[in-house]
A protein has these predicted regions:
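Class I S-adenosyl-L-methionine
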Residues: 1-116, 121-146
Length: 146
């Protein structure tokens, strides 16, 4: 895999949506960089090695996989200047205070971007989101009704 893709998939410098969508069940670890000169013919970029390991303890139950991935997708593609605004659009107005409270408990800045969250933070936000009684996704807005 290309070095930069490997780094992003392993969450170095910020996670991709795909990484965040798999994190509750799989850990990604960067192993090493492989110089382009190690290949024949040599590509124009370095390669990278990484490992994927199934977590011994899931961060989110497998039965919630689809809902969790939809939640992460909505957060990564949602509008807003930070995670507080983005998640605030996913819940009914009366639940927005819960978003800010949960972010505070997690030590996540309101202005943080989705790529800056850890696997554990994503999992705990999802659990909290489920408890807020979000309802079903609204088309176009990425928001949920309550």
């Amino acid at each position: 895999m290309q070095w930069e893709v490997t780094r992003r998939r392993a969450g170095v410098g910020g996670a991709t949506m795909m990484t965040a969508q798999w994190w509750p069940w799989v850990e990604f670890d960067l192993v090493r960089r492989v110089p382009a000169s190690a290949f024949s013919p040599a590509p124009s970029v370095d390669g990278g090695l990484m490992t994927t390991t199934r977590r011994s303890q899931e961060l989110v139950p497998a039965r919630d996989r689809r809902a969790y991935r939809e939640f992460v997708h909505a957060a990564f593609t949602g509008r807003g200047k930070g995670i507080a605004q983005i998640l605030g659009r996913l819940v009914p107005p009366r639940q927005r205070r819960h978003v800010n409270q949960q972010l505070g408990r997690e030590g996540i800045a309101a202005s943080a971007l989705p790529k800056e969250l850890t696997a554990e933070q994503w999992a705990r936000l999802f659990v909290a989101y489920q408890e807020w009684g979000h309802g079903s996704m609204r088309r176009g807005s990425g928001a949920r009704r309550g």
